[in-house]
Amino acid sequence: MEIRNIAIIAHVDHGKTTITDAIMRQTGMVTEESVTMDSDALEKERGITIYSKNTSIFYKDTKINIVDTPGHADFGSEVERVLRSIDSVLLVVDAQEGPMPQTRFVLKKSLELGIKPIVVINKIDKPAARPEIAQEQVFELFLDLGASDEQLDFTVVYAIGREGIAKRSLDDDSKDLTPLLDTILEKVPAATSNPDAPFRMQPFSLGYDNFLGRLAIGRIHEGTIRSGEVFVKKPTGEVRKGKIIKMFTFEGISRKEISQASGGDTVMIAGIPDIDIGETICMEADQEPLPAIKIDEPTITLNFLVNDSPFAGREGKFVTSKQIKERLEKELEVNVGLKVDFSNGDYYKVSGRGELHIAILIENMRREGYELQVSQPQVIIKEESGKKLEPFEEVTIDVPEQFSGTIIETLGKRKGQMTEMKPEGTQVRMVFEIPTRGILGYRNQFMIETRGEGIFASRFLEFRPHAGAISKHATGSMASMVAGKALAFSLANLQDRGVLYIGANTEVYEGMVIGNTAKGNDMAVNPIKGKNLTNMRSSGADAAIHLVPHMELTIERGFEIMADDEYLEVTPHSVRLRKQILNETQRVQAGRKKA
């Protein structure tokens, strides 16, 4: 049976998972109507792919291995690894929005590897769809990225993903995805390898099974694999022995145990507990290892601590230091971009590839019943030959023209350098190079500045010399000086001073941050104070209390607004901000000592 290996790449929410699900339904791999590829609860909720997924379908006596890749830059190294194991990519582009920054990031990687993409212009049923313009923009993007003449001669398929329809031209009367599947068979080269050569494979992804332990997922580059003794080689040439105890292949979204597999196929193997991404599994100790896979370095770091607030242990099922450590160790088995330093007894230092990367880990933990607190995220600073280096990002922004001045001014203050600006209809596309510090906590402000109409995407560039101090608009914190239930009367007086994070009847404790002040100074407040009652009759009827809706705290929003003397307290049902030192007098004394 012939094998085709493809990946699906696209910007967040351009429809790649929807198309994959439709392909699986129409080839009979799954029957239910629900979204199947984004299996993680968070992925379904946010509508984004976080982990690359493997699936296989059978069509016209051909096995097609499909990898659904993440579209967010925080998960970029997932994408890069996957591209090494496939022969073509389906580039899914929204017919209205055209190619977006994340598309650019993944596409550049695939063109550099010599892959010839098939372009799928999706969502052609949108009222504002512009499929021809989107196709032109894709061609221009290919040119920009230095595509070869052969790569520029790409095949285009038009699609309505949610209805499961694909067309070779816009006026085709197609009712299903047959045109797309036929195009894959015609244009994607069949997987080739030498079946008689000694076996070699390189894992591009890791999985975990409670019974089998760490699982390695990869493509067999050559030879045939069976259970038994193997050698594992690091890219440096270091060799150790291992043993394959079980092997699986993918059928639909389920895995099927097999006894052997040949070159070109994608398999999952169990039995090598310390296997890592980029290592080569081979039959002979003197075989050449496959080229190393580069994994993006972490750019931000923060501390995970046991929750010690007055409300600790109320909601969480797993609250101890040991339980948090075990959960982080389990995460390290599969989350390659994550690094954890367990050397300090008081906290665990967790480093990741961006705010979203870490926020998703914390969100998953709280849903599983964990309770913890985290410190303010900090950018990782390196030192090389006596110079401080910090991570820089390329930020691409699409905004209506009237907001461009504000964005340029704001990012200028945050040490951003504009490298490109071009009008696109009523929108302007701007590209900046900016220190990661400059965009930590900026997304929320960006949505306010563009009234929700802007699109913001970033990707890691490199470590560069430290850009110096960054001026940000400082807000102070309103910290409760008492414990109890917040009253509407008190909150109504406080809301004039800034933005509140809590509503009436919320339980608070001393040192809990209940809002921020427009001025830069912290303020100790009493949110439980009621109205003084007297036996005097008031001269007029009491005015009704009107509370402005408060700002709901999420993990990402907490990252944006927290100060360096605060913790974000995360429990299964609540996200709260608190001062590290809860008592106001002790806080003031500590502040004086610092000064």
Language model: regions and residue ranges:
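P-loop NTPase switch module centered on the Walker A-proximal segment
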Residues: 1-93, 97-99, 137, 206-209
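Interdomain boundary/hinge elements
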Residues: 34-38, 145-156, 191-202, 237-250, ...
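Conserved C-terminal guanine-recognition region of P-loop GTPase G domains, centered on the G4
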Residues: 83, 89-151
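Canonical P-loop GTPase G-domain recognition
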Residues: 116, 126-189
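Short glycine/threonine-rich beta-strand-turn micro-motifs
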Residues: 160, 344-357
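Conserved nucleotide-binding/hydrolysis modules and their immediate coupling elements
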Residues: 200-302, 312-314, 475, 484-534, ...
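Helix N-cap motif at beta-to-alpha junctions
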Residues: 222-224, 272-274, 352-358, 400-404, ...
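Long insertion/accessory domains within large nucleic-acid-processing enzymes
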Residues: 250, 255-258, 389, 434, ...
